[in-house]
From Swiss-Prot:
Keyword field contains Transcription regulation: no
Quaternary structure and partners: Part of the 50S ribosomal subunit.
Family: Belongs to the universal ribosomal protein uL1 family.
SUPFAM superfamilies linked to this entry: Ribosomal protein L1 (SSF56808)
A GO BP entry: translation
Gene: rplA
Gene Ontology, cellular component aspect: cytosolic large ribosomal subunit
Domain of life of the organism encoding this protein: Bacteria
Molecular functions (GO terms): rRNA binding; structural constituent of ribosome; tRNA binding
CDD domains in the record: Ribosomal_L1
Protein name from the UniProt record: Large ribosomal subunit protein uL1
Database matches in Gene3D superfamilies: 3.30.190.20, 3.40.50.790
NCBIfam families in alphabetical order: rplA_bact (TIGR01169)
Amino acid sequence: MARLTKRQKAIREKIDPAQQYPVAEALGLLRELPGAKFTESVEVAVNLGVDPRKSDQIVRGSTVLPNGTGKTVRVAVFAQGDAAEAAKEAGADIVGMDDLAEQVKGGNLDFDVVVAAPDAMGVVGRLGPILGPRGLMPNPKVGTVTPDVAGAVKNAKAGQVRYRTDKGGIIHCAIGKVDFEVEALQQNLQALITDLQKLKPANSKGVYLKKVAVSTTMGPGLAVDLASLET
């Protein structure tokens, strides 16, 4: 049996993996656990009562976290004319059309989010094999294909997270950094849960919000007592 590291031993002494913690206590414990050598993200996994094999039960969306993610986000925008100018004024890092497409084809993907005006999708669509596997393909369901490119840029810069259920019906996303105050993390988590409730598929039967767990990038997961969330 592998020997536990000092960090693993310290973590085991602080948490009970079988326990469900009130949300504020769970987030507070994450801040107290021995950390890695970098500022870890706080991540959440939400098990939803959906059948991910059915296309009408895939949950996909985006949430603007009230306290941001703690990350600097670079945004690329495919737009022209007035929309391009609006994107630049909103703080987009890269704005273009065919020239930006050539950058992408050349392997220059120095951005975290891609936004596209509807009339740019003819150009963007051809980049699907490059952007798609990297999770960068714009999509109207998460607000990244929109006439309001300026609004999309501002949302991305403000800390918008995008998510989609995986094959197990689970949503994964980061809700901040471990050095955030507990209240800020709790507000971010609650914003996500509130939006997920709004996205409940009409055909979802039984319990929708089944389990919520929080963790740091390199740390263990803590189950959250659902009664401590506003659902």
